[in-house]
Amino acid sequence: MHKNILSRSLATAFLFGLTARMNAQELVVRIDDMGCSHSANVASIDTYRNGIAGSVEVMPVCAWFPEAVKMLRENPGLDVGVHLTLTSEWENVKWRPLTHCPSLVDRDGNFYPMMNAHKAYPGQSVKENLSGLKLAEVEQEFRAQIELALRHIPQVTHLTGHMGATGFTPEVNELVKRLAAEYGLSSIDRAGSAEDYSFQYVGYDGPHGTLEEKKASFIGTLKKMEKGRRYLFLDHPAYDDAEMSTVFHVGYENVAADRQGVTDLLKSEEVKNVIRERGIKLIDINALTKQLPRQEATKKLAKAADKYIEAVAQAKQDLHSIMVVKDGKVVFEKWMGSGKENEPHVLNSVSKTFTSAAVGLAISEGKLSLTDKVISFFPDKLPAQVGEHLSALTIRHLLTMNTGHEKDPSKLRNTEKDWEKAFLHTEFPRQPGTIFCYNSLATYMLSAIVQKVTGQKLVDYLYPRLFRPLGINNVRWQESPTGVNAGGWGLFLKTEDLAKMGLLLLQGGQWQGKQVLPADWVKEMSSAQVPCVPAGRNSDALPQLMKNAKKSDWLQGYGYQMWRCRHNAFRADGAAGQYIIVIPEKNAVVATTANIGNMQAEIDLIWKYLLPAL
């Protein structure tokens, strides 16, 4: 009886949670001007780690940008925007463009101090000099700022404008919109962005000179937020220190004290309590602009979800999260146990599917082919005598786990420092292509090869090509002792990121009208290329194992780092219950994170309860 009550409570909590999410107020707390000073840099990280800030805008033209880069790379969970800059407002510190653009600067070569006319700075505003402004120079400068940020900061997701730089004329507004699309970024602060992304800018609901006024006015704003709506609040944290005490412009002289107040506001426990009490959900700009759409589940699916959660509890499965996407919209999501919505989860061998995507992209760019010989990439790591089987080993053999090994050599990574050399020095008793043996070190070799031919680690190669277009951020991937991403394991992503990847595969590599992964590669990687058996066995055992094929999702065929499933589905999976399950006949994706040893039992519950309701 107690177990049934617990199970129903969990199910009710899920349904309540989904409804609450769809009706919650969502708030982005954005902090601007990172890079303009050391004080702003430190305060930005402080208000992210210890406060409510979720997105930060960085200024590549400023002197403290290199320090900002270092700090942001140490905090990959902080969402970053490029704060496009055409003005330099402070009296005692100035910044200049990255490119030669005479129409954008004053006689000293600095950006003008103001965007709009200011009586203290006659003739020194962008708008007062519009007649001489060249749009081509604006584009040139914006491109330089964007590319500098993208080169150094992986988690850049969007563009914003310093002092209105992204929308001060219709032509500039359209330019920014075009650049954002070209670079795969969202664009905030231009005309129409609030409507495009369905949010509302909010500020202080009253006086905000002192800290107490800031808190009272900001809490007033929080209390006026309506359920089901999304909001964006921005301000500029820094410290009241010796550095900031020298910073001012006419009309804004108390910069240091004011920005210390912003820092204190964003870290205020009183403010945090109001946010919790009112059920306000803090998100970042990446989520605001690239989150998957939500839709209330059908009655049939809601009932099935109830039964599924109850069955998970009864089976004592340690499920951390599950997300179901149907017809491109999230219809079922839940986090439990140690699973957290906004924290990346270890994916184990789900990592392999992302490595396969990188290989497909490298092939499409002419950097690789399926028939390339593995030994050609590592001439300095080969054994003294290269055998016939090793000589025959190709990229395709690595992808299909048909390397010629009879046993998985992956444990070598626990004792060896040079994993490429260790792999190449193993015995290859069979002809490659004749035996399936699950082999994580083979996937590592794919990662090493991609790094060889692209000059980039897997994660850096995938950011502009896959992660950024899908809005996947805060990516972490473990590395080998020689600095190569593990490839076959060690990737950390959020549950929604898994769902996005599944949806991309379901859509044949297309995302929002663009071909992100080659369609033919998606078809090949998700098709049965070779017969397969569960990890720990090799295909010599296949005749015996096939007697239970109707009940097993590990005997349906293997593609390029993906498994075929029953029900004409395919999947990425990782040890302990990590799944991306793509079900084309239902136009659906199921993503899970977990700590479940019996993964067949885990997927069986999905087939039993959720599949019929999709």
Show which residues each predicted segment covers.
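Active-site-proximal alpha-helical segments within enzyme catalytic domains
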Residues: 442-449, 489-510, 578-594
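Acidic (Asp/Glu)-rich catalytic clusters
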Residues: 44-50, 67-79, 97-106, 150-151, ...
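Catalytic domains of cell-wall/extracellular-matrix polysaccharide-remodeling enzymes
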Residues: 129-215, 219, 223
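A short, well-structured edge-of-sheet supersecondary motif
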Residues: 309-339, 581, 587-591
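Active-site SXXK
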Residues: 328, 345-371, 398, 446-450, ...
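Active-site Gly/Thr loop motif
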Residues: 472-474, 526-589
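C-terminal domain-boundary segment and adjacent tail
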Residues: 184-190, 251-292
